[in-house]
Amino acid sequence: MAATAELIPAGEVIACHTVEDWNNKLKAAKESNKLIVIDFTAVWCPPCRFIAPIFVELAKKHLDVVFFKVDVDELATVAKEFDVQAMPTFVYMKGEEKLDKVVGAAKEEIEAKLLKHSQVAAA
């Protein structure tokens, strides 16, 4: 269990820089049975830079949710796997199931879907 906690620390946005790192951390997150929110981002994307600190605050507030940040240029294969067409894209999942998606830096929508799916995840 300690290994899982180390791979997916609560209260943080977990950045993955290699496919191997991503696969290991996503596997641990899926096994934790927590809601997972993935922010697909890019360094050159102004809306991504706008929403990044808000995403960090959400991670600090929702300790029962696993938050990931994936740079689409670094991990293009992962972005393709999740059918990311625009940045930022937020994907919500639990276990193997993709629950929802938000495209764009829509703070209210991101928070609303986070609350909706974290309540379902807790049930």
UniProtKB/Swiss-Prot annotation:
Transferase recorded as keyword: no
SUPFAM superfamilies: Thioredoxin-like
Domain Thioredoxin: 2-119
Broad class of the protein's primary localization: cytoplasm
Protein name stated in the entry: Thioredoxin H-type
PROSITE patterns: THIOREDOXIN_1, THIOREDOXIN_2
Signal peptide limits: none
PANTHER family named among the record's database cross-references: THIOREDOXIN, THIOREDOXIN H3
Family per record: Belongs to the thioredoxin family. Plant H-type subfamily.
Highest taxon, organism lineage: Eukaryota
Pfam families: Thioredoxin (PF00085)
Purpose of the protein: Participates in various redox reactions through the reversible oxidation of the active center dithiol to a disulfide. The H form is known to activate a number of cytosolic enzymes.
Gene that encodes the chain: PEC-2
CDD domains: TRX_family
Keyword field contains Transmembrane: no
Keywords: Cytoplasm, Disulfide bond, Electron transport, Redox-active center, Transport
Gene Ontology annotations for the cellular component aspect, listed alphabetically: cytoplasm
Cystine connections: C45-C48
Subcellular location: Cytoplasm
